[in-house]
Amino acid sequence: MATLYNQQWQQQELRERCGDMKQIAGCTRYRLQEGPERDVEIIDVRTGSGFRFQVCPSRGMDIPFAEYNGRPLCWQSSTGVVHPAYYEKENIGWLRGFNGGLLTTCGLSSFGGPNEDAGESYGLHDRISYIPARDVNVEQQWKDESTFAISISGNLRQTRVFGPNLVLHRRITTSAGSTFFTIDDTITNEGFVPEPAVILYHCNFGFPVVSEDSRIDAPSLEQAPIGDFAAQTQDSWNHMETPQAGLAERCYAHQMRADENGMVRAAIINKKLDFGAYVEYRAKELPHFMQWKTMACGTYVTGLEPSNAPLISRDQLRARDQLTILQPGESWNFQVRLGVLESTLH
């Protein structure tokens, strides 16, 4: 049954109390109107529980914003949700349109730092988050007498002539009363030769989920620091700090322990507010995990980032024989869930 306002409801009971379910839960589509965000499409989703999030068909079907009862869950950068026409492939130009948000997808041919592999150049984190979706479909309807289901889906084709033809089908689902949504992704090689394919879910948690009162709660068996600063502060990998101007970023590669169902949940919890957010995923599909921690003023964010390959550049993956290869006609499936943690949730 739909749990709303500390009570369970059937379809008929809610229909009697409102003329349109959008009064309680549903989707609204609109376009941004000015600056580099002009003409970017947003789908705003409300579940009625206080959980609200946005889906951006113009930018990889990613999640540029989410909140719960007015509390933001994610970090948002100074760039805004830049229109994909402004994408800069070279070097670290990707950062000029990196909004952060609750989710920015990285891939599909490469991720990590700029590099050259087999005569092809790749910018930071590749281009899937800048590709507009086709075949976008929004459904919001009663699935049965007790479930008002919300579903948003679309197709993202990363391709070029004489190059890869990789298609990401993404479906995002939630329901009235929910405090989470689920992403079901399928990557298909629609070309005729084997292609390297990688995906990383760059989940960016921000204030007030992230604060000096916050800790990471994750089944981490091992943390490998990336770089000297991360190594020097490794003992505090799971502790958040107050913002400091100009403080360098830190990254840690984690080995996670899956539960009895093969799932991994990593969360950031503000102990003072008894409030937090999490990412949950299937370890078999996404066996690698990177933590991105930056406690700098303005870039005050912690990324929890599951992926299907180690977060190193494509040329390094090839050198280590760790490229994940998708055969012609083959598909891979991934499932990720993002949601809220609060002691008062019912």
Question: How does the language model describe each region?
Answer:
Residues 1-182, 194-196, 205-245, 250, ...:
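Surface-exposed acidic/polar loop and edge beta-strand patches at domain peripheries
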